[in-house]
């Protein structure tokens, strides 16, 4: 592994892990719908919010404040259910743990300069399930598990061209870590009953494979009038080279440990446009449209092993997983009401079309949540502001009827249900 790249990877994920042990879980595919409590309370409609969401639009960095410190956490509760009959039967709930996703932000305007510089650390999202007692197609009981963590370190700069127009750019340093179990205690010689003939099923345990990649984001913020703001942003794809972990395969004759690499995984490119409109001094409406290119980023993932710890016939195994995700369009709407004494109420709705094709649906990657209702609250005093938000995702059920066991080892009636879930956000800011 490249030393400099591995140091960056472990630094980013290490800082996040101190605050967020366990699994990240998300709602627009693998992404959180919002970047901070205000954004989340407004349903993720955030690209035209000045000074409050530089992670989504670098042109909004800092706003009117000279210095801004912000930080917070999201508490996530992802209830997922897996059912099948043909290769089961199973009716299993993923362990209902509560997970923590943090963010930290610093912005500093350079004296009277039009430049503002900042640094953001953000647990972007990920995915996680843990089924510890699943009946396999062989009749035994085994485990399904995924823990995918995604974090970004984001150096950011914005430039105020004039009173109406601001431009921004950021370097997106993405770090990913993944662990997965696919029936690790199970082995089958396949339909022909001949071990090593090519149709064997081998149980898999992938441990601590990770890596770092780089992307860029550009943003524009424009005040059309005293009431109307527009925002536009574009994020390039982050190619991630993932290695440094272990691949353990159950080959029937023995459990063999390999050095592991994973290729074919990326964080998607995105484009977003949005508006913020002050209906009155006490009432704001926001709306965004966001395009996420999961089709290019999450297609086929290959896990490759090397340097086995035992002398076995399979020296360099390759396991390919077809995911075939689709492009996703996300629509976000929000409203913000200013009450007396600087109390603010927020409401939002977020709809993201399901990017996961049913024929490649897997209980390991339940990324098919579509609709979310949100509620938020904000209060400011002196130089501080406190923001809270609640996200409620609506139930979504999907069934994989793909009869090909090489692409769907869970049977042609496997159903994954993401039950109604909740995310709580808490954030505190200090501006001067």
Region locations from a protein language model:
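Mid-chain, structured segments of secreted extracytoplasmic proteins
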Residues: 71-100
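Transmembrane beta-strand segments of Gram-negative outer membrane beta-barrel proteins
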Residues: 30-43, 62-80
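Outer-membrane beta-barrel porins/channels
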Residues: 25-40, 47, 87-90, 99-432
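Cleavable N-terminal signal peptides
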Residues: 13-14, 24
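Bacterial N-terminal signal peptides that target proteins for export
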Residues: 2-11
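Outer-membrane beta-barrel pore proteins
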Residues: 47-49, 54-67, 106-112
């Amino acid at each position: 592994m490249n030393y400099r790249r591995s140091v960056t990877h472990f630094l980013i994920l290490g800082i996040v892990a101190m605050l967020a042990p366990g699994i990240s879980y998300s709602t627009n595919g693998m992404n959180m719908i919002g970047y901070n409590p205000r954004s989340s309370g407004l349903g993720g409609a955030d690209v035209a919010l000045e000074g409050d969401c530089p992670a989504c639009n670098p042109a909004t960095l800092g706003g009117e404040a000279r210095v801004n410190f912000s930080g917070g956490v999201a508490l996530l509760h992802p209830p997922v259910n897996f059912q099948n009959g043909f290769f089961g039967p199973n009716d299993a709930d993923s362990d209902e743990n509560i997970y923590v996703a943090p963010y930290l932000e610093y912005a500093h305007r350079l004296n009277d300069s039009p430049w503002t510089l900042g640094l953001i650390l953000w647990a972007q999202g990920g995915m996680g399930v843990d089924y510890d007692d699943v009946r396999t197609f062989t009749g035994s009981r085994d485990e399904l598990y995924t823990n995918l963590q995604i974090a970004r370190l984001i150096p950011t700069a914005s430039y105020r061209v004039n009173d109406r127009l601001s431009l921004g750019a950021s370097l997106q340093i993405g770090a990913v870590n993944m662990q997965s179990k696919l029936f690790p205690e199970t082995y089958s010689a396949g339909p022909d009953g001949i071990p090593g003939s090519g149709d064997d099923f081998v149980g898999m345990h992938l441990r601590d494979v990770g890596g770092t990649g780089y992307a860029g984001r550009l943003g524009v913020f424009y005040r059309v009038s005293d009431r109307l703001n527009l925002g536009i942003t574009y994020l390039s794809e982050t190619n991630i080279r993932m290695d440094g972990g272990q691949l353990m395969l159950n080959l029937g004759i023995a459990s063999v440990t390999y050095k592991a690499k994973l290729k074919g995984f990326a964080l998607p490119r995105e484009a977003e446009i949005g508006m913020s409109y002050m209906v009155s001094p006490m009432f704001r409406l926001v709306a965004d449209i966001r395009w996420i290119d999961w089709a290019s980023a999450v297609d086929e993932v290959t896990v490759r092993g090397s340097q086995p710890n035992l002398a076995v016939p399979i020296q360099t195994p390759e396991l390919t997983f077809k995911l075939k995700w689709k492009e996703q369009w996300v629509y976000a709407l929000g409203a913000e009401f200013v009450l007396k004494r600087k109390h603010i109420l927020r409401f939002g709705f977020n709809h993201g079309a399901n990017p996961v094709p049913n024929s490649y649906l897997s209980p390991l990657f339940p990324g098919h949540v579509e609709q979310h209702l949100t509620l938020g609250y904000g209060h400011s005093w002196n130089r501080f502001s406190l923001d809270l938000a609640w996200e409620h995702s609506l139930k979504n059920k999907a069934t994989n009827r793909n009869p090909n066991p090489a692409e769907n080892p869970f049977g042609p009636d496997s159903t994954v249900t993401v039950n109604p879930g909740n995310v709580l956000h808490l954030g505190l800011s200090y501006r001067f």
